[in-house]
Structure formats: C-alpha cells, structure tokens
C-alpha cells in the first residue's frame, strides 16, 4: 500500500500524528488506550504493536496486562483471554530480546 499510494499513506500517517497530539495524553497513555481499542476490534497484530509501543513509552508489563483485563466486561472472558495471550506473547518476546 505504502509503495503504491505514497501520498495517501503520508496523509494517513499525518492524521495519526495529529490525533496523537490533539490532546493532553502522553505516549504511554495513548499506547495503552490504543491497546484497548485494538483488543476491542480483535486485531491481534495491532494488540502486539501497541503492546510494544506501550513498553517503549515506559509502561510496565503489569500496566499493559491491566489494560487487557479491563476489557473483560465489554468483550467477555474468552476474548479478553485471547487478547491477554497476545500481550503475553509480546512481553515474552520483549524479555527474550533483552538478553
């Protein structure tokens, strides 16, 4: 997509930047919120991505897991557990990458 439609992709990227800076949330809060949004949409790749971004922004593993736990009453237990497993995969990989 990026190679075929570079102008459209650039506009999309700019929209994301503008949305991120339009209010008072910091990078960690944004990443945790986006993790929850990705969980609600059941987008596994996005959960992994926003989990990594949350770590990079200074979120602890406990904070990221808590963000997923909050989805239980909205998504239901099975969906929350699936999202939590995606988070745990990402956290495990991040921990292995440290060594």
Q: What feature does the model see in each segment?
A:
Residues 2, 23, 40-44, 58, ...:
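Residues at alpha-helix boundaries and short interhelical turns
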Residues 65-90:
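C-terminal structural segments of small proteins and small subunits
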């Amino acid at each position: 997509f990026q190679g075929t439609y570079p102008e459209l992709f650039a506009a999309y990227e700019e929209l994301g930047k503008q949305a991120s800076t339009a209010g008072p949330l910091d990078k960690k809060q944004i990443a945790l919120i986006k993790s929850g949004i990705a969980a609600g949409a059941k987008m596994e790749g996005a959960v992994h991505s926003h989990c990594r971004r949350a770590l990079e922004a200074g979120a602890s593993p406990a904070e990221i897991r808590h963000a997923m736990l909050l989805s239980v009453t909205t998504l239901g237990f099975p969906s929350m557990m699936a999202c939590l497993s995606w988070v745990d995969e990402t956290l495990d990989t991040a921990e292995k990458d440290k060594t």
